[in-house]
Amino acid sequence: MTTLGTPLSPSATKVMLLGSGELGKEVLIALQRLGVETIAVDRYENAPGQQVAHHARTITMSDGEQLKALIEAERPDLVVPEIEAIATPMLEALEAAGVVRVIPTARAARLTMDREGIRRLAAETLGLPTSPYKFCDSLEELQAAIDGGIGYPCVVKPVMSSSGKGQSKIDGPADVKAAWDYAMAGGRVSHGRVIVEGFIDFDYEITLLTVRAVGANGEVETHFCEPIGHVQVAGDYVESWQPHPMHPKALETSQHIARAVTADLGGQGLFGVELFVKGEQVWFSEVSPRPHDTGMVTMITQWQNEFELHARAILGLPVSTALRAPGASAVIYGGVEAEGIVFDGVDEALRVPQTELRLFGKPESFTKRRMGVALAYAEDVDTARERAKEAAGKVKPRKA
């Protein structure tokens, strides 16, 4: 039996989120609806999640001592990493000492904080199908890896980055240095290490949201949402839709891969498993042990969206991944470099049938920073995609 307390009282169930962007904000809202006391942590003040949490804290989360001091001061029941750039060795030490429970586990947070840990787990430990790959610490190593078997075309990514930053495709020798420089500029921390992957000529890529939650018998069970299709530009998602049609064999293989990798990572919660698909063939790409940006579409397609599923699963509550209606999401970019922007056209956007908007409340806009998302549902995915893109296009961010 799960018992939940009352916020801001001695009985409170306290959850701390490390990372409070637009995804963290929705998790915090889902937790608050269940009467959980929330602590939103980020590296900058007034982050989206901090605007809705009971408590807002600003620290350098990659600094182990700062992280330890905050956790010991706040004494949360659960710590929920929402980004990669966190001092995971400290989380492992605190979890091992019984100070706090990390979602899904501190080991999972460490393995998924960069592309190397999770790729080696998937390909070398679990034997799951992936693209051919090498890890490189210099431009010379990158060139040697390409010449030694990876070949052209290939994809280069920093071992640690988010939202596609630093990711590029190399079509020939003339592109190698530019790709290395771009990866170095786009890495989340100063790491100087990249993964180079042989290019898979896939038909499409999906996100398979996978939930590990406690069932009625007290055992952890694995649940799958309907597959989410998405379009990425330079590694960053620009639209997604659910469900994405798949060959039954490919869906079965996708679920097998997702079950294997999430079972090894362990714990409870929602995972975003990214996969490449060609016909009946499936390759593992990446996994995030938390809600996924492409999964924002579930705010309009599912009875319980990905954020509610994550909140329920980490609290030991039952979950349902049932689909409510086909739907789509389309990103709204800042388009300007400014603080405290305003949005024109919100009324026009919401006149598009069966649409919703989420404006994230980020304090500062950049040209390609994700500032909101349009959501739409319809009788079919194609109509929903058209509506979402139309609504997103009517929202016009500008300087105040």
UniProtKB/Swiss-Prot annotation:
EC number, UniProt record: 6.3.1.21
The pathway entry for this protein reads as: Purine metabolism; IMP biosynthesis via de novo pathway; N(2)-formyl-N(1)-(5-phospho-D-ribosyl)glycinamide from N(1)-(5-phospho-D-ribosyl)glycinamide (formate route): step 1/1
- Spell out the protein name for this chain: Formate-dependent phosphoribosylglycinamide formyltransferase
- Its top-level enzyme class, in one word, is ligase
Q: One GO cellular component from the entry?
A: cytosol
> From what superkingdom does this record's organism come?
Bacteria
Can you tell me which residues bind ATP? 115, 157, 162-167, 197-200, 205
